[in-house]
């Protein structure tokens, strides 16, 4: 008997271009679509977003295919290279031959220069980015920093849509998501094709599905993901696991667990997982994070009436820095070092 086909999740394509404009009614129409998606499977594709995705994929592929093992070691985060004491988040996440196939390069806010107040203090979760040699990778840093601000701009527009969807002012989220303080990160993940593929790099779920990364909720306010046109993601629904169709023309967007916390799970963080697929592909998430001290008081949108924004009585306010530290630590403890 053949395997039972997995249902396809409802993941709508939403035209987000009105969120860059001034037409309030069109913005509210987008907000209603975001609201419906957020309370269904929790995912939607943002289209007409204004970001050059072929350029993003092409430049990322050029970097992934040209960086050497020695360069990866020189850029490695502390979890892999103990000499790099200050690199907790930013840097290269190494593959381990025979054990771990996925590899990635993470970079943070380009505003975090050596004279930034949070770097000088220093404050956890803030790091100065490390970059490969410009002579060996000409233009890579310029590309990466430009992409950061391109996707930051898109994310700001989408956050305006989320704010309207929740009955808030448009700047409800963006006032906490500022260029000089945001802890948002870009991760350029490579899933390679390998022959043979190392068995220890393949995990098996309780239902027998082979996985590259086990179930989890994202540690973010929202996540804005570009991925290759290779189906790999699954979302957990009341009807069971469902496939999220791949679409390399849009950004796949979902709420993270901070959004779930502050909305009292009105917008939950969808539980999802990454299937094992032995095919060369990219997964390039932008984890949208607020600033270190930014704190949003939780409330229950479902019970707010007549403009009232009642606090969720059993949900304490958590600063974003505290949330991010604990969330990333918990994810590593659960699923291992990426």
From Swiss-Prot:
Positions annotated to bind 2-oxoglutarate: 281
Binding positions for N-[(5S)-5-amino-5-carboxypentanoyl]-L-cysteinyl-D-valine per the UniProt entry: 89, 93, 185, 191, 216, 218, 283
Reactions the enzyme catalyzes: N-[(5S)-5-amino-5-carboxypentanoyl]-L-cysteinyl-D-valine + O2 = isopenicillin N + 2 H2O
Cofactor(s) in the UniProt record: Fe(2+)
EC numbers for this chain: 1.21.3.1
Residues engaged in binding Fe(2+): 216, 218, 272
Effect of residue 216 to L: Impairs the catalytic activity
All residue ranges annotated as the Fe2OG dioxygenase domain in the record: 182-290
Effect in UniProt of substituting residue 227 to L: Does not affect the catalytic activity
Record has Acetylation as a keyword: no
Keywords, sorted A to Z: Antibiotic biosynthesis, Cytoplasm, Iron, Metal-binding, Oxidoreductase
GO BP terms: penicillin biosynthetic process
GO MF, any single term: iron ion binding
UniProt site (Involved in ACV-binding): 283
Gene Ontology CC annotation, any one: cytosol
Subcellular location: Cytoplasm, Cytosol
InterPro entries: DIOX_N, IPNS-like_FE2OG_OXY, IPNS-like_sf, Isopenicillin-N_synth_CS, Oxoglu/Fe-dep_dioxygenase_dom
This protein's record includes keyword Oxidoreductase: yes
Pfam family name, one: 2OG-FeII_Oxy
Self-association and partners: Monomer.
Entry's family note: Belongs to the iron/ascorbate-dependent oxidoreductase family.
Name of this protein: Isopenicillin N synthase
Organism of derivation: Hapsidospora chrysogena (Acremonium chrysogenum)
Gene: PCBC
């Amino acid at each position: 008997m053949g395997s039972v086909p997995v249902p396809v999740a409802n993941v709508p394509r939403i035209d987000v271009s009105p969120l860059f404009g001034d037409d309030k009614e069109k913005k509210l129409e987008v907000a209603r679509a975001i609201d419906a998606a957020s309370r269904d499977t929790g995912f939607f594709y943002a289209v007409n977003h204004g970001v050059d995705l072929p350029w993003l994929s092409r430049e990322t592929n050029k970097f992934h295919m040209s960086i050497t093992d020695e360069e990866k070691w020189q850029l490695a985060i502390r979890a892999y290279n103990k000499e790099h004491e200050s690199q907790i988040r930013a840097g290269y996440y190494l593959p381990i031959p025979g054990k771990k196939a996925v590899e990635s390069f993470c970079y943070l806010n380009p505003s975090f220069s050596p004279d930034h107040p949070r770097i000088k203090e220093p404050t956890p979760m803030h790091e100065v980015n490390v970059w490969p040699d410009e002579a060996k990778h000409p233009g890579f840093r310029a590309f990466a920093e430009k992409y950061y601000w391109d996707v930051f701009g898109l994310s700001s527009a989408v956050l305006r849509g989320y704010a309207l969807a929740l009955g808030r002012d448009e700047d409800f989220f963006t006032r906490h998501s500022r260029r000089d303080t945001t802890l948002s990160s870009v991760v350029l993940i490579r899933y390679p094709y390998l022959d043979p593929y190392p068995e220890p790099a393949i995990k098996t779920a309780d239902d027998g599905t082979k996985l590259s990364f086990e179930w989890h909720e994202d540690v973010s306010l929202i996540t804005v993901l570009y991925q290759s046109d290779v189906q790999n993601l699954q979302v957990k629904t009341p009807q069971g696991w469902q496939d999220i169709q791949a679409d390399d023309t849009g950004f796949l967007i979902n709420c993270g667990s901070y959004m779930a916390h502050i909305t009292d799970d009105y917008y939950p963080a969808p539980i999802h997982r990454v299937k094992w697929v032995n095919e060369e592909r990219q997964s390039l998430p932008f984890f949208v994070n607020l600033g270190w001290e930014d704190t949003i008081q939780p409330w229950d949108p479902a019970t707010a009436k007549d403009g009232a924004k009642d606090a969720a009585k059993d949900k304490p306010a958590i600063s974003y820095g505290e949330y991010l530290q604990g969330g990333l630590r918990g994810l590593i403890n659960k699923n291992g070092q990426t």
